[in-house]
């Protein structure tokens, strides 16, 4: 089944059989990408073996899209044994939402959507005010509510250790207490390929199968597997405002401050989140090969353009302690 060409904002390619490379092997020696793939598939199967009701956290970004491909391979020819869970802030890129819906249909996976707006309406979250309001932190109650409502005991995520210092010290199997919180000083040892998924009632785990991957690994894997992505990852013309060194794309949720003005240039996203906190980079890379070259020469980190990470030195760790992804 091919993605419809009637939808804009999509990089159209069919999600072919995930095992298409098996016939291409002429050697038992694995490449570094195949080693990373094998490690991730092993962890996904370990999750299926140890937990009763897992889920895959799906943002619509490149890492979670790669996670879907890995899950297909881990359990082929069966369907994915867990649903995709997306937390919709209401401030997402439209291209991401369209791609999310089509991919879920393409791989025949159940899609569960947690709503930040519903949490605000119910009084469980409060909208930020001020010059730089964001709903990024408000994803926490929406996510924890979805986990509690559906009684998930393990949530697979696409976080990687090279992204940010808080994620660099997190385990593959990351324990969460009954409040959904993470204690970085109380993490379990992980020796070789042994993972301890024991927990008490009401607790759960966050599992990160691609922890050892880098941004370059992800893009090389996307090329190797011919994986389709939302068009915002590729160079396109868009209006934006420069704020504190971050290029924020024009949207109804961003109000210009004194002295600011909209600019227009060719840009793309290196990482995808809310429009209010996802910084773009000026780029002419409009295909995967060009992006791989760009990443190899980059002197700024992948999340260096994320406004939510610039709120403090420990911004990510503080959010994770409260139950963030």
List the model feature ranges, each with a label:
Residues 6-18:
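Short, positively charged and aromatic/hydrophobic N-terminal segments
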Residues 16-325:
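Nucleotide-activated chemistry modules centered on ATP-dependent adenylation/adenylyltransferase
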């Amino acid at each position: 089944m091919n993605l419809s060409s009637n939808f804009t904002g999509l990089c159209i390619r069919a999600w072919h059989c995930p095992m298409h490379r098996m016939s291409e092997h002429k050697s038992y020696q694995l490449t570094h990408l195949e080693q990373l793939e094998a490690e991730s598939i092993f962890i996904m199967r370990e999750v299926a073996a140890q937990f009763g009701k897992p889920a895959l956290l799906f943002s619509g970004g490149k890492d979670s899209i790669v996670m879907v491909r890995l899950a297909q391979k881990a359990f082929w020819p069966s369907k994915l044994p867990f649903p995709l869970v997306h937390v919709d802030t209401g401030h997402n890129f439209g291209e991401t939402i369209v791609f999310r819906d089509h991919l879920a249909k393409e791989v025949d996976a159940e899609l569960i959507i947690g709503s930040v707006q519903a949490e605000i309406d119910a009084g469980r979250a409060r909208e930020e005010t001020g010059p730089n309001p964001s709903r990024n932190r408000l994803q926490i109650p929406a996510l924890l509510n979805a986990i509690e409502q559906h009684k998930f005991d393990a949530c697979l995520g696409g976080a990687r250790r090279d992204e940010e210092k808080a994620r660099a010290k997190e385990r593959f199997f990351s324990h969460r207490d009954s409040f959904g919180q993470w204690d970085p000083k109380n993490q379990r040892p992980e020796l070789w390929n042994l993972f301890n998924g024991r927990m008490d009632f009401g607790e759960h785990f966050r599992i990160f199968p691609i922890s050892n991957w880098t941004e370059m690994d992800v893009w090389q894997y996307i090329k190797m597997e011919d994986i389709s992505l939302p068009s915002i990852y590729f160079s396109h013309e868009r209006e934006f405002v420069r704020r504190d060194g971050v290029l924020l794309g024009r949207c109804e949720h961003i109000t210009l401050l004194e002295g600011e003005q909209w600019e227009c240039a060719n840009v793309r996203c290196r990482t995808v989140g809310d429009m209010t906190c996802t910084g773009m980079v000026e780029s002419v890379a409009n295909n995967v090969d060009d992006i791989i070259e760009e990443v190899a020469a980059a002197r700024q980190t992948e999340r260096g353009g994320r406004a939510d990470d610039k709120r403090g030195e420990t911004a990510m760790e503080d959010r994770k302690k409260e139950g963030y992804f």
